[in-house]
């Protein structure tokens, strides 16, 4: 199963309501076969701009990151679930940055002088 990261912005709510929303979201992930690794609270802060979601205007929101493994088929249904949840302002699922393929730098590859001089410019006769 690939590793994903869920970035959530929740409505500004009291602590019990926020906990209930997070619990509901995590349970929805696990119902779809996900294995949750970590939940990180990034705090409540002002949104960068006013966001309309579910017929409401939001100026503040709680930011959360959820790190999880899930089957690829579960991601699409989870995005749909998040879009219907009235307490979620924004939800975005991306592949975890640490699992993306990284290529090692091969260093500087020397180019032969003749190829460098004659490959791009042909001399006039």
UniProtKB/Swiss-Prot annotation:
One biological process term from GO is: translation
Q: Which family does it belong to?
A: Belongs to the bacterial ribosomal protein bS6 family.
Keyword list, A-Z: Mitochondrion, Ribonucleoprotein, Ribosomal protein
- Name the gene that codes for it: MRPS6
Q: Which organism is it from?
A: Homo sapiens
Q: Name one GO cellular component term.
A: mitochondrial small ribosomal subunit
Its subcellular locations are:
Mitochondrion
For this entry, the protein name equals Small ribosomal subunit protein bS6m
The superkingdom listed in its UniProt entry is Eukaryota
Q: How does it assemble?
A: Component of the mitochondrial small ribosomal subunit (mt-SSU). Mature mammalian 55S mitochondrial ribosomes consist of a small (28S) and a large (39S) subunit. The 28S small subunit contains a 12S ribosomal RNA (12S mt-rRNA) and 30 different proteins. The 39S large subunit contains a 16S rRNA (16S mt-rRNA), a copy of mitochondrial valine transfer RNA (mt-tRNA(Val)), which plays an integral structural role, and 52 different proteins.
Q: Name one GO molecular function term.
A: small ribosomal subunit rRNA binding
InterPro entries assigned to the protein according to its UniProt record, in alphabetical order: Ribosomal_bS6, Ribosomal_bS6_sf, Transl_elong_EF1B/ribsomal_bS6
């Amino acid at each position: 199963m690939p590793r994903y990261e869920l970035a959530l912005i929740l409505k500004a709510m009291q602590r019990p309501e926020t906990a209930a929303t997070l619990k509901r979201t995590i349970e929805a992930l696990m119902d779809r076969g996900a294995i949750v690794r970590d939940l990180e609270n990034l705090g409540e802060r002002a949104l960068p701009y006013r966001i309309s979601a579910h017929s409401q205007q939001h100026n503040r929101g709680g930011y959360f990151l959820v790190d999880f493994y899930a089957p690829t088929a579960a991601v699409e249904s989870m995005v749909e679930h998040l879009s219907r949840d009235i307490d979620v302002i924004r939800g975005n699922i991306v592949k975890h940055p640490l699992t993306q393929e990284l290529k090692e730098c091969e260093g500087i590859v020397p180019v032969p002088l003749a190829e460098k001089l004659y490959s791009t410019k042909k001399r006039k006769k």
